Amino acid sequence: MKNVGFHQRNELGLKNAYKSKNKIYIDNDKMYLAGTSNLQDVWDDLKIPLNLTRFSQRYQDADNLLKENPQVKKIVGHSLSGAVGLELQKQHPNKDFDITTYGAPVVQVGGQKYKRFRKSGDLISGLDDGAITYEGSMNPLKAHSYTGYN
């Protein structure tokens, strides 16, 4: 159970991100990015399969905060923002972020470079074969949650 503290810390950071106005929370060297939370995010969700994540509002906000917070080395994202975290790494190849995603809409067959987690029953992250899958719920909203990874 070496990752119990790991997931609990990420859950707390993501809760703070969901509470913040811009859905981003920075704690020392970690940036936490909340998932889809408003109509703009729903629109931005549609950009992910078109490889246009860098044009989403959450990406723009996170990128600006990264410039103001060069100490950030770890990025934790849920759902939409899991994709945003991966895009931040792609757009900043000179950085080597430690990225963790929960329920991210990632399409990958095999292999895993970053720490990616999903739950069975989560339709949003269903195509991410590279994620570690935990037992989920038949309720897709519960299965898509960033909580309960312990």
For each predicted feature, which ranges?
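Alpha/beta hydrolase fold serine-hydrolase catalytic domain that processes acyl esters and thioesters
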Residues: M1-K74, Q91-N150
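Gly/Ala-rich beta-loop-alpha elbow adjacent to hydrolase catalytic centers
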Residues: V76-S81, G85
